[in-house]
Each structure stands twice: as C-alpha cells, then as structure tokens.
Swiss-Prot record:
Recorded family membership: Belongs to the uracil-DNA glycosylase (UDG) superfamily. UNG family.
Entries under CDD domains matching the protein: UDG-F1-like
Coiled-coil zones: none
Organism: Pseudoalteromonas translucida (strain TAC 125)
Catalytic residue list: 61
Localisation per UniProt entry: Cytoplasm
Name the UniProt record assigns to this protein: Uracil-DNA glycosylase
GO biological process, alphabetically ordered: base-excision repair, AP site formation via deaminated base removal
Gene name of the record: ung
C-alpha cells in the first residue's frame, strides 16, 4: 500500500476536490479528450512513495497532445517519438552538466520517479490542445496541500523550481528543512535566460551526497 493512501483518501473527500473531480468526469463524459487518462491522473503518487522522496520537480499542467501525458511532469510515454521542447532542453542541460549523460531518444522519466524524484504538476488534468484549460478548478489547492505534506513529513528534500510559476508555488517551502534550487523554465522561451548552465542536476547530487544519500542516476 502506498504511504500516500491516507493523505489522498482524506484530501480527495474534501468538497473542493469533489467539485474538481466531478468537473473532470463531466468533461470526459461529454466526449472531451482530457489528459492524462483517468487511471494515470495520480501516477506521481504511485511512482514515488512519500517516504522515498529525495527530490521534487514542479511542473505546470500536463502535456495537451494526444498520448503524451501520463501523470509525471515533463515525462512522456515511451512510444512518443517527438519529444516536447522543454524536455529536449532538460536533456541538453543534463548533457552539459552530467559526465557521460547520453541524450535519450525517448522522454519516459519513470526511472527518476523510482529513485525518489517526485514529478509533480501543479494542475493534474488538461483538455486536448488547450493549455491551462483546467487552471483554477481546485488542483492548485490540492497540490499546495501535497507540498505542505512533503514539507512536514520529509527533510532534506531538494525542490527544483523552474520558472516564476513553480517559484511562486514553492513560497511556503521551509528552506531551513529543505533545499531549494530555482531558475528559469526550460521552455524555448526562457531556457537561454539561465536555464542552460544552471547545473541543477549536479547540484542536486552534491546536496544528496552531503546528506549521505545516494545521488540520482539521471540517465534514462
């Protein structure tokens, strides 16, 4: 059983989340393509146990192209051939930051999640072709609670906050208990403003090693 179970059970029963889930279900029943598929909306919580979290990467909302999103931020399913631009830029930075990192031909980041990298989007659903279409439905409140829960129950976690959206979201993180790495978003619009060269991946591993923890193998 996941150690997220009690938290999820309690939070998903709250009135605001019932409204969110009802709206998403209604849109699906009307024939609207909502991503990720229903059984993958909470994939981040099954991929990474609370007690295993060592790193948190915050995204915005899921990819809105067909067959891409599967519940882990920035990640796409293995069969996706055309990688999203932000993920390509993440790989470029990894190649310059981490010795021997080979840029993959796929964008499936499940192995990061299995090593304790919690890949959380701020908003957990989106409609096809409509970025931010499920903004302000209640997901933001839910993911605020998730971050607070991690902040309370874990220590020494490295929060990677790319872009103003993630940095605003991370304002409540206790920097005395956790580590924060902040910088521009990897999207093509901002990657050249300081995302390239941020070296957040090697910095994360240095922070983990300073705590006596195993570094992340970023190769996927």
């Amino acid at each position: 059983m996941s150690d997220w179970t009690a938290f999820l059970k309690q939070e998903l029963q709250q009135a605001y989340m019932q409204q969110t889930l009802d709206y998403v279900a209604k849109r699906r029943s009307e024939g609207v393509a909502v991503y990720p598929p229903k059984d993958q909306v909470f994939s981040a919580f099954t991929a990474t146990q609370l007690s295993d979290i060592r790193v948190v990467i915050l995204g915005q909302d899921p990819y809105h192209g067909e067959g891409q999103a599967h519940g882990l931020c920035f990640s796409v399913l293995p069969e996706v051939k055309k990688l999203p631009p932000s993920l390509k830029n993440i790989y470029k930075e990894l190649a310059s930051d981490i010795n021997d990192f080979v840029i993959p031909t796929h964008g499936y980041l499940q192995s990061w999640a299995e090593q304790g990298v919690f890949l959380l989007n701020t908003v957990l659903t989106v409609e096809q072709g409509q970025a931010h279409s499920h903004k302000h439905l209640g997901w933001e409140q839910f993911t605020d609670k998730v971050i607070t829960h991690i902040n309370t129950h874990c220590e020494g976690v490295i929060f990677i906050l790319w872009g103003a959206h993630a940095q605003k979201k991370g304002k409540g993180i206790d920097s005395a208990r956790q580590h924060i790495l902040a910088g521009p978003h990897p999207s093509p619009l901002s990657a050249h403003r300081g995302f390239f060269g941020c070296r957040h991946f090697s910095a994360t591993n240095a922070l983990l090693q300073s705590q006596g923890k195993t570094p992340i193998n970023w190769q996927v």
